[in-house]
Amino acid sequence: MALRICVTYTPALPIGLCTRCCLCLEQSPSWCHCLRGVSFLTFHLHQSVPLGDRDSLLMFTRQAGHFVEGSKAGRSRGRLCLSQALRVAVRGAFVSLWFAAGAGDRERNKGDKGAQTGAGLSQEAEDVDVSRARRVTDAPQGTLCGTGNRNSGSQSARVVGVAHLGEAFRVGVEQAISSCPEEVHGRHGLSMEIMWARMDVALRSPGRGLLAGAGALCMTLAESSCPDYERGRRACLTLHRHPTPHCSTWGLPLRVAGSWLTVVTVEALGGWRMGVRRTGQVGPTMHPPPVSGASPLLLHHLLLLLLIIILTC
C-alpha cells in the first residue's frame, strides 16, 4: 500500500528515489510504516512550486533524498520512530516554504530588471560568477561559505561574504547563506544544512527566521563535530566505533546550545531588524508586524522550544 501511495502521489520524483523511500518504510512496523509514509507525503504535497525547470527539479531531488536518508538512519522503534516521522515532516515543511519564497523572489527580481537588456543581464551574470568563484577560492579554513547565487531567471547576487565559524551566530539571521560547493573543506553535504539559513531572509519574518537560523546553525555545529563525516545526519545518527568522542556524544548538546546561542545573540544585537538586500549588501529590511496580542520575544522562545523538542526527542 505504501509503495502504491508513494508512486501515485510523488510523480515529480525519480522512480529510484521513490523506491528507496518505500523500501525503507516496508522495513518498519505497520504504524511506524504509516507515520513515515505520511511524513514523506507531507514533505512532497506541501511543495507549491511547479518543477518545470531542470534546476528546481535537481534541487528538490537533492533535498528530498537528504531528508529520506535522514529518516532511514537508526532503524528505531516506538517513540523514536514517531520523532523521526515528525522531524521529516517539519523539515519538509521548511523546504516547501524555502521553495515558495524563492519563487516569489524570482518574480520580484524579474520585475526589477524590466528595463535591462539581454546583453546587460549576461554581463551581470558573468560578474556574479567571477565574484562567486573568487570568494569560494579565497575562503580560509574553518569558515562557512556564502556565495552569490543565481536562481533560474535571476542574475542578481543575493548573498555575499564568507563568515568565520566564530561569527556564525552573529550573522546567522543578518546574512542569508544560500549555497555552497558540494564539498566544503572535505565535508560533503554541509551546504544542505547551510541552505536553511537562506529562508530567514527569504521569508522576511522574525518568527520563521528564528526557526530557520537556529536550525541551520545548530545542525551545522552538530554535524561538524562528527569525525566520521559521511552524508548529513546519517553520519550523526549512525553509531561509529571511534577512539574520540563523536557526534553521538556531542551532537545533542551542540544542537541545544546552538539554538539558544542563536536566539540570545540575535536578540542582543537586534538582528531581527536586519536582512540582506538583493544587491548583496547587509542592511535594514521591513518585517511584517507581529500578530496582535502576542509578544514577539515570547513567540520566538516558544518556537525555539518547539524546534528543540523536535530535534532532540
From Swiss-Prot:
Keywords, sorted A to Z: Proto-oncogene
Keyword Membrane in record: no
Residue segments, region Disordered: 107-129
Keyword Secreted: no
Coiled coil: none
Domain of life: Eukaryota
Record's protein name: Myeloma-overexpressed gene protein
Source organism of this protein record: Homo sapiens
